[in-house]
Amino acid sequence: MKSKHFRLLWLGQLFANLGDVLYIVGLISILYAAKESAFYLAMLPFLNTFGRFAGGLLFPILLNRYRLTSLLAGSQCYKTVVLFILILWISFQPPSIVWPIFICIWIIAFLDGWAAPAMNALVPRLVKREELVKANSFVAVIYETTQLGGWAFGGLLTVIFHGEHIIWLTFVLFVISSIMMKGIVDETSLKAKRKKCGKRDEIKEGWLLIWNNRFMRSIHIVIVLETAASVVWVAAILYVFVSEVLHVTEAFWGYINAAFFTGLMAGGLCCLKFAFCMERHMRKIVISVSIGISIMTIWFGLNSITWIALILVAFSGFLEQVKRIIINTYIQTEASLEDLPKIYSAQHALISLIFGLFVLMFGAIAEYVSVKMVFIGAGFLLAIAALYMTVHFPAHFKKGAPPYS
């Protein structure tokens, strides 16, 4: 936790995450001013989701040719360059021509598809094994703090400045992040890389590592179910729920968002405080919180009282963060350091794909059936995940040798 390189990692990620939030805020402002169309705004999450999916899919090819630290720093540096090109286009071209903006958005999302697995895979290389829960909790708290603070700060900036100025601020944050990422050194001694194989085999490697290990396969089945269920918290569905079920103005969506992120932060702080205790009882805790999230989600869908909705959302965020940290720590503990980036690459590609598909599916259910049914359906998906985890989640962690040969 006190390692200089871990400090550079989380500081670099802090500036990158804050920049990512302000980048989205600035783009929303620019696109809406140019087109005043919900369709163009909807292109933002679509391009982000499938750009990250493509980046995660191709990450293993790069992993066999470059060091993990080089990929993380390179991703951030290239994002900074593409963002500068985007700023030049916005500054000197008519705002009505948006297709170059969409190309830049996709490229930045593609580069993010490298950064996410690289970041997660570097944590166990830069901290001691017994500090993993604490390190993951700390990184989670930093992320949620920048998300909560970034959206609030971004909303304030849009009132004062034009979207173009917000993008310039993002550029400055990206430059600072790039400098810090370049300073990270991974001193881990790894096994020699295996002999070269075809690009298709390289892409499949992480997927096969997950599928061929029983515990990893079980964990990722749960991740798929819970990713599908998490779609209910996107703005498009919450807006409808706030209007049709809670019968309050759309501004209440902001309170729900704040309550959820507050719960996430509280969950991260709780894991940070009680890391040692949690590491000894991971199985019991992760099963209990999974059941709790399922109950909270169904209850939220059936509830129509505003203050109860805020409490349920905050508790859901708290439990969700605890579960994420435990599952992430389990994966980092069980996989070898050589295999971990490939596993995270496949995982992030899978999450992006599932999330993108279920956004469309749940959006259609909210439109043509009932937004309440969306939350009830998500709750049942979470219940299935909790039941599956009760049977398949390992009772203990392996010590010593990694599970992959």
Please place each PLM-identified region on the residue numbering.
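Juxtamembrane intracellular "pre-TM" segments in multi-pass secondary transporters
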Residues: 1-6, 186-221
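Hydrophobic core of transmembrane alpha-helices in multi-pass small-molecule transporters
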Residues: 14, 97-114, 308-322
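Intracellular juxtamembrane helix-capping segments at the cytosolic ends
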Residues: 27, 114-127, 322-335
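Transmembrane alpha-helix termini and helix-breaking/packing motifs in multi-pass membrane transporters
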Residues: 28-34, 87-92, 149-169, 244-245, ...
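C-terminal transmembrane bundle of multi-pass solute transporters/carriers
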Residues: 42-48, 54-65, 69-71, 75-81, ...
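Cytoplasmic helix-loop-helix junction between adjacent transmembrane helices
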Residues: 105-145
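Helix-loop junctions on the cytosolic side of multi-pass membrane transporters
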Residues: 121, 125, 167, 171-197, ...
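A single, central transmembrane helix in multi-pass transporters
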Residues: 161-168, 208-266
